[in-house]
């Protein structure tokens, strides 16, 4: 498929954020300034006493699941398509309900595709609401590598300040167009989520909190760039083969006028 080029890259980005948040990378890096070794907070060791929950187990989510298992964690997964995916993955994924997913977990990784259609059973704007995350039975690390709209920043920041979230790693933001424009002086941080996103970004950059951010670049590996270039050439060839009217596989985020 023409959409497979970045599966491993995005999955590895999720694991990078897991290591940063669990390892409290900002604090440990800043401690080097004075070579402080006595007052550091203990980091979260990844082992089989810790549980991670993966939300959304398509190709990328499945790879995230595998990498978390390879790091010694207990892993569970939440996906509305669990029945069909369980068969597809030969019963190798521990699927649980949405309610079970948040309980007794230490690390939450969002890998769901965004569905904005309210009538769809897959609708997930605001899925990780403050109310849902408060059902966690212990403080969690929160990782998001697909779409910011699924996990509004204002709720994440509030829960972090309340000690319910221990660290945030995100490659995505709720309104990336407005956020980018505001960051570049062409707009205002005029919503709770934009203000929270700015605070998370600022504190990630000055290393004052356990926050780690990227500007939607989780797919940007060296290998993925090569694979995407190959896919682009194949796509162009298909276009001309079909008389400039269609591709063999129409990607959902491209529309033909």
Which residues does each PLM region occupy?
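Short, charged, surface-exposed secondary-structure boundary motifs
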Residues: 8-12, 85-89, 177-181, 223-224
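Phosphate/diphosphate ligand-binding glycine-rich loop within oxidoreductases
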Residues: 1-32, 44-45, 142
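Rossmann-like dinucleotide-binding domain for NAD(H)/NADP(H)
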Residues: 139, 146-257
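Rossmann-like dinucleotide/phosphate-binding beta-alpha-beta segment
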Residues: 42-138
């Amino acid at each position: 498929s023409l959409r497979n080029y970045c599966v491993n890259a995005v999955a590895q980005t999720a694991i990078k954020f897991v290591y940063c948040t669990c390892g409290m990378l900002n604090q440990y890096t800043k401690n080097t300034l004075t070579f402080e070794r006595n007052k550091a907070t203990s980091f979260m060791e990844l082992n089989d006493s810790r549980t991670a929950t993966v939300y959304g187990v398509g190709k990328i989510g499945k790879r995230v699941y595998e990498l978390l298992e390879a790091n010694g964690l207990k892993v569970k997964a939440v996906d509305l398509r669990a029945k069909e995916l369980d068969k597809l993955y030969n019963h190798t994924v521990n699927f649980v309900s949405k309610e079970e997913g948040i309980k007794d977990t230490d690390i939450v990784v969002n890998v769901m595709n965004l569905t904005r259609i309210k009538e769809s059973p897959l609708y997930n704007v605001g899925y990780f609401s403050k109310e849902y995350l408060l059902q966690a039975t212990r403080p969690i690390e929160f990782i998001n590598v697909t779409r910011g709209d699924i996990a509004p920043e204002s709720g994440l920041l509030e829960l972090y300040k309340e000690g319910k979230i221990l660290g945030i790693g995100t490659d995505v933001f709720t309104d990336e167009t407005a956020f980018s424009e505001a960051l570049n002086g062409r707009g205002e941080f005029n919503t709770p989520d934009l203000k929270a996103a700015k605070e998370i970004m600022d504190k990630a950059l000055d290393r004052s909190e356990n926050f780690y951010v990227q500007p939607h670049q989780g797919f940007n590996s060296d290998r993925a760039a090569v694979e995407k270039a190959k896919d682009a050439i194949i796509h162009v060839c298909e276009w001309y083969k079909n008389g400039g009217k269609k591709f063999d596989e129409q990607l959902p985020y491209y529309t033909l006028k």
